[in-house]
Amino acid sequence: MNMFIRRIHLWLSVPLGLIVCIICLSGATMVFDSEITESLNPSIYKVERPEGAVPLQPSQIVEKVHRQLSDTVEVSSMEFSADPERACMLSIKGAEKKSLSVNQYTGEVNGWTESPQFFQTMRKLHRWLLDPPASKGATSVGKVIVGITTLVMVALLITGLVIWFPRTRKMLGNRLKVAFGKGTRRLIYDCHVTLGFYATIFLLLMALTGLTWSFGWYRSLFYDVFGASASSGTATANVSRPSGEKEEKDGQKEFDYSVWNNVLAQLKQEYSEYKSISLEAAQAKVSLPGNMPRTDTAKFNPESGKITGYSLYSQTPRSDKMKGWIYSFHTGSWGGIITKIIQFIAALIGFILPLSGYYMWWKRTSRKRKNAAPRTAGK
């Protein structure tokens, strides 16, 4: 039985091992993409808070942005962080994939946020092998290959764990540590066996959550296992303009941004602690403290700005929470910086495992050929 499992482990790993390397390495590079991006662009994400200064009202910020850019610029949302030294972020209609950074104390435009090309390439490599689908929800050859490889990776991790399981206490001691100073071959073997064991649970977590983006049938099954429905998420209307309007412009009515002033004041009074508050056309979202994504939504009267009701995260159906949970566990953000570091190391080990496996397979086959040569010559 053990020999059969070893053969399954080998036959699955040889053809797809290099793709596993690509998926794991590209995933490792993205663990700290937001931290690296922000550290490379401090003027975009950080502002200096003058002593005794208070942030401008949302309507004042919009007015100053219009003066610097154009009065035709349409602000669709505005995000204020609880960190007084973090810039205010504006979403502009027509610029969906980036935000406009503004100093909330002066109204000065800092510039646009934009993910570095390196991380964009790594994301495409990680998810689609540089072959992204033509549209959201569509499929592509690269997406299918990544999905199949991830399924195989799950099988490799499980069979590898079965093979690792020691028969004696001495074997257990050897398989829990890496032996340095005993040659390259032993070091590579220990890296494959020992480091692979320590990283297995984290690699399985990444693979099992990552598959939800590859296959619809798997996503439905995954949700069912946790008592949720993949298709029962509450649809939220995308309202671009509420009825609290003023002057007409090109046949449409302009949103009165002063409404946001009242909404923001109420939310700051209601929530003593929060990560950020995002103001939108007909609702506001309050991101709650913690590593897991948790958001309360407030509906407000678009004419007066008075909050009329809340949709609390604690009362949200499990099916609506699943996407945030899956992302947090896949990226390692669920436990903060510590779990992200662990996830990064585990992904690097995932990159090393196929390479060390190829090395051991090559050494084993080379030895068999050498042993077979004298027997052939003797005949």
What role is predicted for each listed range?
Residues 1-379:
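Conserved histidines in hydrophobic membrane contexts and catalytic metal-binding motifs
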